[in-house]
Amino acid sequence: GVCTMRDPQIVEKAYEVGVGGNIRGMLGGKVDDLHGEPIEINATVKMLDDREIPVAGADSTSRQNVGRIAVIDHDGITIVVTEAKAATELMNIFKCLNIDITGYKALLLKGFNKAYEEVYEGIVPTGHFLIPDSLGITSPDVRKAGHFTKIRRPVYPLDENVAFRYE
């Protein structure tokens, strides 16, 4: 499989050892304690890059700066690690890094699935998107987006046993 992740410390380690080098460390889980623990990796550095990534579907001048990039392999999983946040649903980072995602069995992206369908149309068959049910804005369960306190309650879909009604 292949995925993207922001982790400046892992990128730094990758740049220290260079392409072909081996890095050990804890990947991810460093922003907060809501999205899981870091995982221990023992990875080989496959590629290093430092450029802005063209935004898919935008004009030719639109770019996103994700900082330095390290492409690593951990147990057969290709991980694109960036220094800054990378909005994978809005950009073609894999194409820009010459990573052919069509050869992978799984492509792990966290974000808005409708945006994925646009960006990856023709690459990933329609209906083959698995929507991650994680905390925050990316969850299909809006109750996980946070605590809603300034709205009339009970309300669908935030409260149980409340039917949807259009007003």
Language-model segments: what does each one mean?
Residues 1-84:
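Hard-cation-handling environments
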Residues 53-167:
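Extended hydrophobic packing segments that form well-structured cores
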